[in-house]
Every structure is written in C-alpha cells, then in structure tokens.
Amino acid sequence: MSVLITKIKLYNFRRFREYVIEPNEKCNILIGDNESGKSTILEAIDLVSSGNMRRLEAIGLDNLMNIEAVTEFVNGSRCYNDLPKLRIELYLSETSDPTVNGENNSDKKECDGIKLVCEPNEDYRTEITEALLTQVDYFPYEYYSMRFSTFADQAYTGYKNKLRCAMVNSDKMDSEYATNDFIKRTYYQYTEGDPKERAIFKSKYRQMKNNFRANSLVPLNGRVPQDKHYTFGLKSSVATDFENNLMIYEDEISIDNKGTGKQIFIKTDFALEHSGSNVDVILLEEPETHLSHVNLRKLVRKIAETQNGQLFIATHNSLISTRLELNNVIILHCDSDNKPVVLKDLSADTAKYFRKVPPASITEFALSRKSILVEGPAEYILFEKFYETVSNHRPEDDGIQILDVRGLSFKRYLDIARLTKGKVAVVTDNDGDVLENCIEKYADYSDNANIKICYDTDESKHTFEIVLYWDNKELCDELFSNSAQQYMLNNKTEAAYTLLCQDKGINVPAYIKEAIEWIRR
C-alpha cells in the first residue's frame, strides 16, 4: 500500500516564512503567479523524501533559508536565541512503520511523518555569539546543523527511504545529472523488493569489466614498452559503477538521445507505470513544456487514468487544470497568507463541465485578483479600447484580466470566484428580460460583494450591438451605411473590428463603464 502526504508544513524555506498545505489524496494541481512557490513545494517534497545530505549541502543552506528571516535577524537583535530555523515537515498517512511515528513535529501530535530541520549547532554557540558581536551583516550559515529525521526522531538517508518519490522536471531535461538521477531512482524503485539483486548486478558488471581488461585489452597492452610498467584499463570510480552507467531505452534508442518533449513523456510514463507499488508520490514540474498540444493531451489522459499513488503537478496550463478536475487545483499567490486557495469544494457538476468544454483560460481566471467576463468576441475585441477610454489605463496595468466567456458559462466561473475570492464583473446582455436574465439568474451571487452583474436596463436594447449602435449612431451609420444596426447584428466580430480600427472616439455604453469603474475600486 502506498504512503500518502496528508500535510506539508514549511518554515523559513525559500520564499515561505510559514506555509501549510493539506493536499488531496490523489491529484494536486499547483497553479500560481511567477515566483509564487509552485516549484518550491515540489522541491520541498523531493528534498525531504530523498534524505540526501550530499544534495542538500550542494544546494547550500544560504540558498534555502528564507531571505526575509535572515534580513530580519541581521537587522534585529542578532542574539543567538533568535536565530531562525528552517523546517520542512511531511505528515504521512499511516505507514505501519514504527520508526516514522512520534510527536517530534510542530503540531506536537503523535502521527507518521518525516522532516528536515536546519538550526544553529549548539556545539558552536560560543563561535556564533562571538562572530555576531564582531561582524556586521553576518549570518552563521556554516554553523548550522542539517538533519533528516522521522517524527520518531530517527535519522534516515536515501538508502532508507520512508517516502518513495519520483521527480520529472521539464526544466532540467537536458541535464545529464537529472537524467542519471531519474534512472538511478527508478532502478532503486524497481529493485527495492530484492536488495540482493542489486548486489548481483554490481558483481556481474564488475566481472564483465575485469574480463574485458584481462582479455580484450591484451593486444593493446602488448604494444606498451615493458620497462614502462604502464597498462591500459577501465576507469574504476563511482561515476563509472553499474548504477551510474544504466540507461533507459525506447526502441533501442536511449532517452538522452530523444527530444526534450519525448523525454518528458517517457519519464512521466515510467513514473506513472509503477505509482502506488514502487512509487508513492510523483512530482511533475510543468509537463506542458516542450510538448505539442496533441502529446500534451496524451500525457494528460495517461495521468488521469492513473489510479494509484499521489500526484503533484506544477503548471500554467488550463488543459491540465481542467482535464484533471478543477477540484484538484491548489492556487498559490505571491502575496497570500500562510495557506493556498483550494478548489476541492467546487461542485462536482462545475468541475465536470470544465473538463468537457475547451479550457478557455481557466487558469488565468483562477489566478486573477480582478477579472471582467464578457459575453462574446465582439465585446472582447472592443473592451480594451473601452477600458482605456474610461480609465486612461490598460487593463494589465491595473492587474485586470478580460475574458471572453459564453453567457451560459458565467455562473460556472462565478462558482470558482466564490472560492478564490477574486473580484469579478460580469458584462452581459439582458436578452429582452432584465428580471429573468440579469437579476433572478444571478440571485445566488447577489450577496457577494466581490461579484457584480452589469447590463443595460432598456429591454429594447437586448444585445450589445444594439446598445453600441444607439450610443454611437452617427459613427456607425457612417461606417456601415443606413442599415448599420442590422449589419452589426449580422456581422458582430467584423463590425467590432472595424470600430476598433477607425480613428474616431467611441462612446462607452453606460453598463460597461459601470463595470470598469467598479472593478478598479
């Protein structure tokens, strides 16, 4: 039975001063702004599960410790007892392993888990105190201890994994180290049930090298002058041992000779194939990178069909977010509190709806603090011009997202907005009945201060083109002849584009102006 992560707690790790995530049991889709910490979450899981001290030292504590915590200390008391600590805790489902169960966690509760703690080494208290007294802007990274341990306070290493983790990072596909690390981890996972088998492989590989040297190199060494005492042989080092010379092949071609997109697909496929049996947790870093749309759809389908193990996927892609169910989305913001926004409470019906329809920038909407939803392409074409006319700003300057959403989808988006607490203005047609189409239809959202429905109150002006025509009659008649209104109704996007490209000013309909002014407050 696979082990699951039930909670992640970060203290002074990279950008996070204090952060808590309670992940879903199966799939977790991390979306967020740039620098919001998506990759940091994956790194935290991968680092703690690895128990690899050498890797930790290679990264360096100065690159892992939260810079705000360091600055605050340096500019503050500079007292030994106030030195910040770095801590990553992974709370686990019941593992039936007594060595991981205990109360050595920040919750002070008996449960299963593993952690990384970096803190001042008490053995160097005197040296640290003296350095802090004599050196300005000094922080004693080199006097910190770093320890991987379980909640039972037992140390562990990569050879005694408590959580089996597979990481596929699209940003490092061209890295020889990343490929070797992936292959080695995969090999360990495939052979974890029989450590004796690993010893046999190593022994046979060493014998093969010895036989090659003893037999095949004899003619070559025979040409070396005997008085030189030199011979040709094979390298004998960690870099040339059996595990470091393994390679994964597809159709007789090694994966390091495959394209980057193909490497992503193969590595993810390998990890998914044994999720739940040899792998507990799979971490995917922006799998959409380097993949064509068709191959991305194949990869998403393969991920969706995976029944075992726990997935963490960092992405910017709406296809991934919607096809793998919006309920699984976890939203990180750069300026958020100590918890992310989760969509696990989104109705199953709405999640299913977005899984079936085109992705339609749903990730951008979920991340946006302020959004304006418009009903069709004609409104969308002209909306930036309207916005600049009303505010003398561009929407992006004010951090506002404009999205073209079919009218039937408005309520689906508003369901998401209620969870993200984003500010949303809906610009919609009254379709000839204000009460039914604009008031009663959105009654469930009327008490939400972050949602506003904007529409023209004149029921004779039932659609955007008619409102636009009567607010700009002279200009429209000039551009589209005497039957301008009918032309605009029959050629909505073409008419909107023509209005956008002409040089004269356009009067902004009152309900659109209302939406723009409200969203900017």
Indicate where each model-derived feature is located.
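Switch/communication elements of ASCE P-loop NTPase nucleotide-binding domains
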Residues: 1-49, 242-364, 380-381, 388-390, ...
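Conserved P-loop NTP-binding catalytic core
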Residues: 43-108
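Surface-exposed acidic, glycine/proline-enriched linker/cap segments
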Residues: 62-79, 347-367
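Conserved catalytic network of the ASCE P-loop NTPase/AAA+ motor domain
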Residues: 79-83, 106-109, 139, 272-277, ...
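Electropositive, glycine-dotted interaction segments
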Residues: 87, 94-210
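Conserved nucleotide-binding/hydrolysis micro-motifs of P-loop NTPases
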Residues: 94-97, 119-124, 152-153, 288, ...
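Extended helical coiled-coil dimerization/tether regions that scaffold
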Residues: 186-266, 270-281
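Acidic, Mg2+-coordinating catalytic modules of nucleic-acid enzymes
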Residues: 361-372, 380-521
